[in-house]
Swiss-Prot record:
CDD domains reported for this sequence: GroEL (cd03344)
Source organism of the structure: Christiangramia forsetii (strain DSM 17595 / CGMCC 1.15422 / KT0803)
Record text on subunit structure and interactions: Forms a cylinder of 14 subunits composed of two heptameric rings stacked back-to-back. Interacts with the co-chaperonin GroES.
Matching SUPFAM superfamilies: GroEL apical domain-like, GroEL equatorial domain-like, GroEL-intermediate domain like
InterPro entries the UniProt entry points to: Chaperonin_Cpn60_CS, Cpn60/GroEL, Cpn60/GroEL/TCP-1, GroEL-like_apical_dom_sf, GROEL-like_equatorial_sf, TCP-1-like_intermed_sf
Lineage: superkingdom: Bacteria
Membrane-spanning residues: none
Protein name: Chaperonin GroEL
Entry binding sites for ATP: 29-32, 50, 86-90, 415, 495
Region span, Disordered: 526-546
Amino acid sequence: MAKDIKFDIQARNGIKRGVDALANAVKVTLGPKGRNVIISKSFGAPTVTKDGVTVAKEIELEDPLENMGAQMVKEVASKTNDLAGDGTTTATVLAQAIVQEGLKNVAAGANPMDLKRGIDKAVEALTADLAKQTKEVGDSSEKIKQVASISANNDDMIGDLIAQAFGKVGKEGVITVEEAKGTETHVDVVEGMQFDRGYLSPYFVTNSEKMTADLEDPYILLFDKKISSMKDLLPVLEPVAQSGKPLLIIAEDVDGEALATLVVNKLRGSLKIAAVKAPGFGDRRKAMLEDIAILTGGTVISEERGFSLENATIDMLGTAEKVAIDKDNTTVVNGAGDDKAIKERVNQIKAQIESTTSDYDREKLQERLAKLAGGVAVLYVGAASEVEMKEKKDRVDDALHATRAAVEEGIVAGGGVALIRAQVVLSKIKTENPDEATGVKIVSKAIESPLRTIVENAGGEGSVVINKVLEGKKDFGYDAKTETYVDMLKAGIIDPKKVTRVALENAASVAGMILTTECALTDIPEDNAGGGGMPQGMGGGMPGMM
């Protein structure tokens, strides 16, 4: 396909228009008084959301050059969402601010490579300062509630429920979000286990919207070797198929003819089935398979124990109320194992934790213990309508990710204040040349943008508030909800440090790429206007027939 080639200012301006189009749509959602965005769908009701990444993912622009800019900033939002689970709007706002300031300087003759080096140095210094500002969350359910409430758009009820869920399953437990049958939102704790292995083929997916394979009341086959041949599996498959129940296969690997046949049977609908790799490696894999066997009331089919796959019977299979599998994880809920056997296994792992001298082994044993004893907390989100349910579920997902990030890396003052406080370290950075120093100044100005946007969305004047916050010390900041100046930590306006850090790093990374772009290639659309007509000679005599 032919390419349209744009250079220099023409390329950068086109990309900037795309960046602005996407960022302006996303940033209206930032802060306690941020607004909703309504997204039209080709079928069904429109989606109403206040989640930055949901808005970003829907945006495709007509102009190919502008669309390139939009897609690059979309990458900032989705990468931040993948790593931190929240902070997507902050990341987008930061990226737009760095691009805006940077392009002004490039147009004025600054060297883009030096600017990028300055930007990278500034981000490194800010990240180090954020680490100094961080306070640990520990087991404080009050702090967990505050982080969750803010991330759920100041919804205290969601904050309470997430704090409750963390209280029940602990940091190591697994928390999932489901749609409730009624209008009530509540937390249920279900005994269960999650491990980090996803489905072996996307053809096993049963829910194409979420890309998950959900098996209700399945049999679970546990095998410690690779399965390549279908004939080994047939003795077990036949009675399972007759029972009409789904089957989950957990083995070292399933490949070749065996995997192909399972996929074909799943697609034909003759067998509800999914296969995942066994978690862990070596001896740890054997131990984890045994954990799953005890939890589900099954037996690990292992040649070491004298069992072989072709002689396996349906009695050796475990069962569970439900198994949910996505591309990365498998969650087994309400395994049918014997409570006494599970308790004995838990005590055995606790004894191993006490006797081990290796920190790594201790960590892995604690993970296994949490999976056996911690259980799964399910947050059921209820609402009066489907549209409200989806919007609320998005907020609960955000809040949950933010809370995990806070538990992992601690918290800093929220509302954009942590970045403003970190600004002072930028004046101490040693730079090689004036353009590098300009790169540092670009970041210094850009990190004011989250607070500025929060204030403007609340109807205030950004510059006035920023100056007032700069005059204050430590956690002094602006509460846009009440439009007053407060101590952010005492007022419970806090952000996970991980979210702020990841947003800043991703924004600077993509903005740096845009600033150092000198040439953009886009496809020239082919003109298909004459493509489908008749050959010329055929149409010539038609008018005379009238």
